[in-house]
UniProtKB/Swiss-Prot annotation:
<dbReference type="GO" id="GO:0005737">
    <property type="term" value="C:cytoplasm"/>
</dbReference>
<keyword id="KW-0436">Ligase</keyword>
<comment type="function">
    <text>Catalyzes the attachment of isoleucine to tRNA(Ile). As IleRS can inadvertently accommodate and process structurally similar amino acids such as valine, to avoid such errors it has two additional distinct tRNA(Ile)-dependent editing activities. One activity is designated as 'pretransfer' editing and involves the hydrolysis of activated Val-AMP. The other activity is designated 'posttransfer' editing and involves deacylation of mischarged Val-tRNA(Ile).</text>
</comment>
<dbReference type="InterPro" id="IPR002300">
    <property type="entry name" value="aa-tRNA-synth_Ia"/>
</dbReference>
<keyword id="KW-0862">Zinc</keyword>
<dbReference type="GO" id="GO:0000049">
    <property type="term" value="F:tRNA binding"/>
</dbReference>
<keyword id="KW-0648">Protein biosynthesis</keyword>
<dbReference type="InterPro" id="IPR009008">
    <property type="entry name" value="Val/Leu/Ile-tRNA-synth_edit"/>
</dbReference>
<dbReference type="InterPro" id="IPR013155">
    <property type="entry name" value="M/V/L/I-tRNA-synth_anticd-bd"/>
</dbReference>
<dbReference type="GO" id="GO:0005524">
    <property type="term" value="F:ATP binding"/>
</dbReference>
<protein>
    <recommendedName>
        <fullName>Isoleucine--tRNA ligase</fullName>
        <ecNumber>6.1.1.5</ecNumber>
    </recommendedName>
</protein>
<dbReference type="InterPro" id="IPR033709">
    <property type="entry name" value="Anticodon_Ile_ABEc"/>
</dbReference>
<dbReference type="InterPro" id="IPR009080">
    <property type="entry name" value="tRNAsynth_Ia_anticodon-bd"/>
</dbReference>
<dbReference type="InterPro" id="IPR001412">
    <property type="entry name" value="aa-tRNA-synth_I_CS"/>
</dbReference>
<keyword id="KW-0067">ATP-binding</keyword>
<dbReference type="InterPro" id="IPR014729">
    <property type="entry name" value="Rossmann-like_a/b/a_fold"/>
</dbReference>
<keyword id="KW-0030">Aminoacyl-tRNA synthetase</keyword>
Length: 1043
């Protein structure tokens, strides 16, 4: 009888809000912490977000991962503090203020006033903090908002100063001039890892310019995609080992010089030119040339405009001759510095030409490309002009093109500690594992010195005070600054400390005009969050390195990296032990999620529609937890709800329906007296196997392998155990079998809700609250995570049940393929497979028979005479690989014995001996089919072949009608929302065939539908049905209860 309700009618959003309110009012999170005080500390670092924007799926994903691990560790007995922190400084905040105050021109902030600007930044830092807290609260994540740390707090900033001073004391800090990524929109340098965060495909000019040689009739052909840098050209480089050619135009006689390997790239028609000579690159070194522009002709006397050797020069692109503007290229800078070539930088911090380039003064450099090319064309200096599509770095915050530019900056000597960083990385357990030697390891190998100073305002000021003659003082604490200035210091932002002058040794010292890269703030977070070393030394050191950290893949070049730099430098050890790296959540179309494009649903609407548990499980059970990108689909979340969570809710509803009906008391039964059936022992064995798998996966931080076992178990529970055991729960008498069924399902729910609690905390709490007893703890989240009960684990039973389910699955596939309803009984079902496996399935014959609705089951160790499995070559797969041998393979496959075919199915490969050659075939190389006698159909898996006898007798047809009637009547019971115990009166208007079937199977039909009275009518108002081709009208009503 299929009439129990489908779970609570309470909406998901209402249920989750109810549970959230329960956690809040009863302070369950606080109690979970208090219960573990004094236990082993489990520490993790939580990457601080900016509260100037709303959370997106990436934040919720990383937060969910952290929540799962934190909940599991707590349930596993650890004390897991979960302080939240906020990133308050830097470009994200400043940029928002600039937009709101319309401070768009160079110098606008200074004109507005730095102090006023910084205070405006302070005001908006927590613009969306309430929304952030609500999102985090709504997704079911537990964090402590009562003790948040903020990068703008004086205590945090003082610890950042301490970190900087410690690095300085180790000789790891220096001031220098280098070519670094530079945001002209922000007017500040960026770090190399920031520059790598936002590459785009762009169209840029591709031009080849003629540089006339002095004392030589030829011109060098020089390629560039940045024409604006040509005004700053100081040298060209050639490869000493490269062979160069002199080419003459057959008509004009004009001569050009370029790399021999580049010749075909620029000269496609050999009839238009001739190669006059070839020579090594060394023959060009030292020659002088005429630059494309003469803005800096005076620099020739200082060594400009000569040809230099460059080992970096290649012929894979361009011309083999490289234009060098040392102020705008890293390789250019070092080569020119090595050869004492002067440098010019006629570009200001906003990307505009200075007065040194009067023709373009005040104009943005990229907008001058066209004018520069036009000017060169007018001078006859352009050999080629086209466009090129290539990847180019953009500012990660303003989405404007970056340039590379020489700036004066403060650097951390990362290259000095590279080996320490690599050694630290070896001690970290990364998930997925390939991050260690792959993306993160390779980034560490290529680590460069870190430009940590920014020409900005709202940030932690770099604590360096400098005198006019260049002496410096590096301050490491507030106390030290107060002693040197004689002033009380309460705020460390620049508009306060820049007013402080230090007088020492007869000199005046003023602070340098830079703030820290905000990544330096967050890299110092493990220490600064606790005001270390000024306070909380024991707390900080006991939690270092962190047990766990989790962020997105982009943080391998961001926060993971900056944390590692500082930790390796200060302590020569990793800053965290275990790391989970997630991929990026993209829009469903594969593009980046964009508010402007409106190409994704809001997270809050998803949670209110499908529930936070569904969103959590959708993310956790996807490739995104393996550092792969996920195309977000609300249909995917809906699928998780319908296929996983609702069935689990229905199990609870089923259990509650019958325990309430029959009065099962969880406090009042003796487990020792329960006589468990085989299927009870199977589901309990399966349960504790899942416990072991989840524990093992969580211990190794593999969330994707932790989720799959319990998701699969839900299917095992709902679509096998409950379905197979319904009748046991229906028993009106208090039989040992019914008690065993109740006891089994109660144990499953009590253990399983603890297994799933870290992952889907709402539904686990709902289950727990509805089945807990007076002796239970207040919340499932105050319970211990279960351990595997080895006394209840039976691997052989799990294997046997797995085999039975595999056989049933094959049978159902055949029925579906050949359009044979399961309600249509069939006479015979044959199973072919290994004898040892089939021998163990004798006790499951009845189960298989009932599941497939067949009368008779026969096991064979070899295929019966009426079925033959055939194997043919898959020409599409094999054709290219084996060529003409395909005919020999076809013959060999045709001659395979049934035993050899079974070996292929079992091993999923087969070796064929073709004379002198052996060829290995895999499943994708062959096509499997089955030849059967008329009336039979067959299908195989790796272990079993099943054959279904499809021949229908009159008796089978009549029985099918009776089963169809039961199905339709019980559907009407559900639709009319009858109670599971309601008896009914049944009336029908139907054909003679259906009438006969009903009368023949009346006892069965009445028992299955709780029918106490039935009658037939010639005319009837009711619901119309098709009963296997017989139009039938059925009406039901609740029978009068006896007094």
């Amino acid at each position: 009888m299929h009439t129990e309700g489908e779970g609570s009618k309470e909406s998901l959003a209402s249920r989750e809000e109810r549970i959230l309110n329960f956690w809040k009012t009863q302070e369950i999170f606080q109690k979970s912490l208090k219960n573990r005080e004094g236990r082993t500390l489990y520490s993790f670092y939580d990457g601080p977000p900016f509260a100037t924007g709303l959370p997106h799926y990436g934040h919720l994903l990383a937060g969910t991962i952290k929540d799962v691990v934190g909940r599991f560790a707590t349930m596993d007995g650890y004390y897991v503090p979960r302080r939240f922190g906020w990133d308050c400084h830097g470009v994200p905040v400043e940029y928002e203020v600039e937009k709101s105050l319309n401070l768009t021109t160079p110098g606008a902030i200074e004109d507005f006033g730095v102090a006023k600007f910084n205070e405006e930044c302070r005001k908006i830092v927590f613009r969306y903090v309430d929304e952030w807290e609500h999102y985090i609260y709504r997704v079911g994540r537990w964090v402590d908002f009562s003790a948040t740390w903020k990068t703008m707090d004086a205590s945090f900033m003082e610890s950042v100063w301490w970190v900087f001073r410690s690095l300085y004391d180790q000789g790891l800090v220096y001031e220098g001039v280098k070519v670094v990524p530079f945001s002209t929109k922000l007017g500040t340098p960026l770090s190399n890892f920031e520059a790598g965060q936002n590459y785009k495909e762009v169209d840029d000019p591709s031009v080849v310019i003629k540089f006339a040689l002095h004392g030589d009739p030829g011109s060098l052909l020089v390629w560039t995609t940045t024409p604006w840098t040509l005004v700053s050209n100081m040298a060209v480089a050639v490869g000493p080992e490269i062979t160069y050619v002199r080419v003459a135009d057959k008509v004009s006689g004009e001569q050009w010089i370029l790399g021999q390997g580049c010749l075909s790239r620029w000269f496609s028609d050999p009839d238009t030119y001739e190669v006059i000579e070839s020579f090594p690159g060394t023959a060009l070194i030292g020659k002088s040339y005429e630059p494309p522009f003469n803005f800096f002709e005076q620099k020739r006397a200082e060594g400009a405009y000569t040809i230099l050797p460059g080992s970096f020069v290649e012929e894979s692109e361009g011309t083999g001759v490289v234009h060098m503007a040392p102020a705008f290229g890293e390789a250019d800078f070092f080569v020119c510095k090595e050869h004492h070539v002067p440098m010019v930088c006629p570009v200001d911090n906003h990307g505009c030409f200075t007065e040194e380039i009067p023709e373009y003064q005040g104009q943005y450099i990229k907008s001058c490309d066209k004018g520069i090319i036009k000017s060169l064309k007018n001078q006859g200096k352009v050999f080629y002009h086209g466009t090129v599509v290539h990847r180019y770095p953009f500012c990660w915050r303003t989405d404007t093109p970056l340039i590379y530019k020489t700036v004066n900056s403060w650097f951390i000597s990362v290259e000095k500690i590279k080996d320490k960083m690599l050694q630290a990385n070896k001690k970290i357990h990364w998930v997925p594992e390939h991050i260690k030697e792959g993306r993160f390891g390779k980034w560490l190998e290529g680590a460069r010195d870190w430009a940590i100073s920014r020409n900005r305002y709202w940030g932690t000021p770099i604590p360096v005070w400098k005198s006019k003659d260049g002496d410096i003082l590096v301050i490491g604490s507030v106390e030290e600054l107060e002693k040197l200035t004689g002033e009380k210091v309460s705020d460390l932002h620049c508009h306060f400390v820049d007013q402080l002058k230090i007088e020492k040794d007869g000199k005046s010292f003023h602070r340098v005009p830079y703030v820290f890269d905000c990544w330096f703030d967050s890299g110092a977070m493990p220490y600064a969050q606790n005001h270390y070393p000024f306070e909380n030394q024991k707390e900080t050191e006991s939690g270092f390195p962190a047990d766990f950290i989790a962020e997105g893949l982009d943080q391998t070049r961001g926060w993971f990296y900056t944390l590692t730099v500082i930790s390796a430098a200060l302590f020569d050890q990793p800053v965290f032990k275990n790391a989970i790296v997630n991929g990026i959540v993209l829009a469903e179309d594969g593009n980046k999620m964009s508010k402007r494009l409106n190409n994704y649903p809001s997270p809050m609407s998803i949670m209110n529609t499908y529930g936070a548990d569904a969103l959590r499980l959708y993310l956790l059970d996807s490739v995104v937890v393996k550092a792969e990108d996920l195309r977000f689909s609300d249909k995917g979340v809906e699928s998780v709800l319908k296929q996983v969570l609702l069935p689990l809710t229905n199990v609870l509803s089923f259990f509650k329906t019958y325990t309430d009906l029959y009065g099962f008391d969880a406090n009042n039964y003796d487990k020792e007296e329960i006589s468990y059936s085989e299927i009870d022992r199977w589901i309990l064995s399966n349960l504790y196997t899942v416990v072991g798998k989840v524990r093992e996966s969580m211990s190794s931080y593999n969330l994707n392998t932790a989720v799959n076992p319990f998701v699969t178990f839900i299917d095992d529970l709902t679509n096998w155990y409950i379905r197979r055991c319904r009748r046991r729960f229906w028993e009106s008498a208090d039989t040992p079998d019914r008690r065993a069924a109740f006891a089994t399902l109660y144990e499953v729910l009590t253990v399983f809700c603890r297994v799933i609690a870290p992952f889907i905390p709402f539904i686990s709490e709902d289950i727990y609250q509805q089945i807990k007893t007076e002796n239970s703890l207040e919340s499932v989240h105050l319970c211990d995570f279960p351990y595997i009960d080895l006394a209840k684990v039976f691997p052989d039973l799990e294997q046997r049940m797995g085999d039975a389910r595999e056989i049933v699955g094959l049978g159902h596939s055949l029925r579906k393929e050949h359009k044979l309803k399961v309600r249509q009984p069939l006479a015979n079902f044959y199973v072919v497979g290994p004898k040892d496996r089939l021998d163990q399935l004798d006790s499951f014959k009845q189960l298989i028979s009932e599941e497939l609705n067949v009368k008779n089951i026969v096991f064979y160790k070899e295929a019966p005479s009426f079925v033959k499995t055939t194997v043919k070559p898959n020409f599409r797969s094999l054709g290219r690989r084996v060529g003409e041998k395909i005919k020999d393979i076809q013959k060999a496959l045709a001659s395979l014995s049934q035993a050899q075919i079974q070996q292929l199915l079992t091993q999923e490969y087969l070796s064929l001996n073709l004379g002198s050659e052996e060829i290995v075939l895999h499943m994708e190389d062959v096509l499997i089919s089955w030849e059967t006698d008329p009336g039979y159909v067959a299908r195989s898996s790796s272990l079993f072949t099943v054959v279904l006898d499809c021949q229908l007798t009159e008796e089978l047809v009549v029985e099918a009608i009776s089963r169809e009637l039961v199905n339709k009547i019980n559907t009407m019971r559900r639709n009319q929302k009858l109670h599971v115990s309601d008896r009914i009166v049944l009336r029908m208007q139907t054909s003679e065939e259906v009438r006969k079937a009903f009368l023949h199977y009346a006892d069965y039909i009445c028992e299955e539908t709780l029918t106490t009275q039935s009658e037939f009518a010639d005319v009837l108002e009711g619901e119309e049905w098709d009963i296997n081709g017989h139009p039938t009208v059925i009406a039901i009503e609740v029978a009068a209860r006896p007094h």
